[in-house]
Amino acid sequence: MGILGKIKNKLKSIGKRVIIDFYRFLDNSGVLKIYEKILEEAIDKDNLPKHVAIIMDGNRRAAEIYGKDRYYGHYLGAEKVREVLRWARDLGINVVTLYAFSTENFRRPKEEVDKLMELFEKKFYEIADDEEIHRYEVRVRAIGRINLLPKNVQKAIKYAEERTKNYNKFFVNIAIAYGGQQEIIDAVKKIAEKVKRGEIEPEDIDKELIDKHLYTANLPFPNPDLIIRTSGEERISNFLIWQSSYSELYFCDIYWPLFRRVDFLRAVRDYQRRQRRFGK
């Protein structure tokens, strides 16, 4: 990178920090609390999305703003999860799916991936033993190619799933080692095996049959009504591509660790302002 490129990036970083400082000023002044209240009162509790999926993007860029390493950004992002789940639950949303780690993310530097795996292991154990999780009867599940994860992470996931398997008040799905295209490929392979064994005929294959063979098959409301992506990127990045055919998409400029309740409420309000046609 040339000197002009470095200067440009530095100015961009400074600009983001100014915005963050401004957000903090608003928080401290109480203006955002007033706006939050206005948004909350504007939301129709009878027209909430049943399932909200979130692409939690921007951890590394948030770390750059603070002059920290990437792990710091991932740590902040993991801490943000608890807050967002509380916002969703308190609002009356039933299901939240979080895109935590894609199959493509394995291509990142080994040191970063290793630290992420340590963080995932720690957080799954924390979730499983969290008093709030049990008080509100939250069911926790991981979806993806779990077999690709280190054994210690698989063990932590199993522990969290076992500890919460009998709950049905609120559902949290963690998409980890997940890829939407791979999910469809895996579903097709399972169906092909059943055709080969004579259990089903090719003519039996339809949308409902494919639904039953996806990672999300046993989830309540498997198709998200609303998908939120943070960081300003406007794409779904191989996330729930089968299930999101009629999802409403909401893109938010703020990085995931800096995501605020007011941003969440704005996404829900925006969802309620749209007319869902489902292809009609």
Swiss-Prot record:
InterPro entries: UPP_synth-like (IPR001441), UPP_synth-like_CS (IPR018520), UPP_synth-like_sf (IPR036424). GO terms for biological process: polyprenol biosynthetic process. SUPFAM superfamilies: Undecaprenyl diphosphate synthase (SSF64005). Its EC number is 2.5.1.89. It catalyses: geranylgeranyl diphosphate + 7 isopentenyl diphosphate = tri-trans,hepta-cis-undecaprenyl diphosphate + 7 diphosphate. The keyword Transferase applies. Keywords: Magnesium, Metal-binding, Transferase. Its cofactor is Mg(2+). Mg(2+) binds at D57, E248. Binds 2 magnesium ions per subunit. Catalyzes the sequential condensation of isopentenyl diphosphate (IPP) with geranylgeranyl diphosphate (GGPP) to yield (2Z,6Z,10Z,14Z,18Z,22Z,26Z,30E,34E,38E)-undecaprenyl diphosphate (tritrans,heptacis-UPP). It is probably the precursor of glycosyl carrier lipids. Belongs to the UPP synthase family. NCBIfam families: uppS. This is Tritrans,polycis-undecaprenyl-diphosphate synthase (geranylgeranyl-diphosphate specific). It comes from Methanocaldococcus jannaschii (strain ATCC 43067 / DSM 2661 / JAL-1 / JCM 10045 / NBRC 100440). The gene is uppS.
